[in-house]
């Protein structure tokens, strides 16, 4: 079974590129990372930084998560991210996404030993 940490890496990490390569980036990535298998995942964010830098956020600024939980952390620095959002005309199994690049602080929830990101909460 996929661990929460491995799921975070599959759904949110793309260290191989510094930004989205094209407007088709989200359509390709959402499919290749298995987020369009049983339904179209409506929203997802990819982080274009090293895994070590993203894992380090777990020891950075302690903040509340959107759901009120307290295990969230905000990155001290901005990170290169790509937001993927399902389009209005998207219909499973033909999931379609808009690709939006940004530089923002990320907020992640962390757990475990080693203490690593398991949930992408928000970007600010």
From Swiss-Prot:
<keyword id="KW-0456">Lyase</keyword>
<feature type="binding site">
    <location>
        <begin position="41"/>
        <end position="45"/>
    </location>
    <ligand>
        <name>substrate</name>
    </ligand>
</feature>
<dbReference type="GO" id="GO:0003676">
    <property type="term" value="F:nucleic acid binding"/>
</dbReference>
<keyword id="KW-0964">Secreted</keyword>
<keyword id="KW-1015">Disulfide bond</keyword>
<keyword id="KW-0255">Endonuclease</keyword>
<feature type="disulfide bond">
    <location>
        <begin position="26"/>
        <end position="84"/>
    </location>
</feature>
<dbReference type="GO" id="GO:0050830">
    <property type="term" value="P:defense response to Gram-positive bacterium"/>
</dbReference>
<dbReference type="InterPro" id="IPR023412">
    <property type="entry name" value="RNaseA_domain"/>
</dbReference>
<feature type="compositionally biased region" description="Basic and acidic residues">
    <location>
        <begin position="1"/>
        <end position="13"/>
    </location>
</feature>
<comment type="subunit">
    <text>Monomer. Interacts with and forms tight 1:1 complexes with RNH1. Dimerization of two such complexes may occur. Interaction with RNH1 inhibits this protein.</text>
</comment>
<comment type="similarity">
    <text>Belongs to the pancreatic ribonuclease family.</text>
</comment>
<feature type="region of interest" description="Disordered">
    <location>
        <begin position="1"/>
        <end position="24"/>
    </location>
</feature>
<dbReference type="Pfam" id="PF00074">
    <property type="entry name" value="RnaseA"/>
</dbReference>
<dbReference type="InterPro" id="IPR001427">
    <property type="entry name" value="RNaseA"/>
</dbReference>
<comment type="function">
    <text>Endonuclease that catalyzes the cleavage of RNA on the 3' side of pyrimidine nucleotides. Acts on single-stranded and double-stranded RNA.</text>
</comment>
<feature type="active site" description="Proton donor">
    <location>
        <position position="119"/>
    </location>
</feature>
<dbReference type="InterPro" id="IPR036816">
    <property type="entry name" value="RNaseA-like_dom_sf"/>
</dbReference>
<dbReference type="GO" id="GO:0005576">
    <property type="term" value="C:extracellular region"/>
</dbReference>
<keyword id="KW-0378">Hydrolase</keyword>
<protein>
    <recommendedName>
        <fullName>Ribonuclease pancreatic</fullName>
        <ecNumber>4.6.1.18</ecNumber>
    </recommendedName>
</protein>
<feature type="binding site">
    <location>
        <position position="66"/>
    </location>
    <ligand>
        <name>substrate</name>
    </ligand>
</feature>
<feature type="disulfide bond">
    <location>
        <begin position="65"/>
        <end position="72"/>
    </location>
</feature>
<feature type="disulfide bond">
    <location>
        <begin position="58"/>
        <end position="110"/>
    </location>
</feature>
<feature type="binding site">
    <location>
        <position position="7"/>
    </location>
    <ligand>
        <name>substrate</name>
    </ligand>
</feature>
<dbReference type="GO" id="GO:0016829">
    <property type="term" value="F:lyase activity"/>
</dbReference>
<dbReference type="GO" id="GO:0004522">
    <property type="term" value="F:ribonuclease A activity"/>
</dbReference>
<feature type="binding site">
    <location>
        <position position="85"/>
    </location>
    <ligand>
        <name>substrate</name>
    </ligand>
</feature>
<feature type="active site" description="Proton acceptor">
    <location>
        <position position="12"/>
    </location>
</feature>
<dbReference type="InterPro" id="IPR023411">
    <property type="entry name" value="RNaseA_AS"/>
</dbReference>
<feature type="disulfide bond">
    <location>
        <begin position="40"/>
        <end position="95"/>
    </location>
</feature>
<keyword id="KW-0540">Nuclease</keyword>
<feature type="binding site">
    <location>
        <position position="10"/>
    </location>
    <ligand>
        <name>substrate</name>
    </ligand>
</feature>
